[in-house]
Amino acid sequence: MDPAAAADVLHRTLKDPKRPITVADASVESGLPLRDAEAGLTWLTSEYRGHLRVTEDGDLVHLFAHGFEKL
């Protein structure tokens, strides 16, 4: 799947874009395969100035402090 198309699916299905989300969680919420969820989150991170963080448990999470709004 094209990263922009995967991002569109994630944009429509993620319940709370302001909370930290892992690729696995995005995959479960959206129904996308892991590969597509990762590509979509990467696209959204670039498009909406998201950030990547590592949790204390070592999980990589995507953060969108302003949700899916362009500033």
PLM regions and their residue ranges:
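A composition-biased, non-transmembrane "mature-region" signal
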Residues: M1-L71
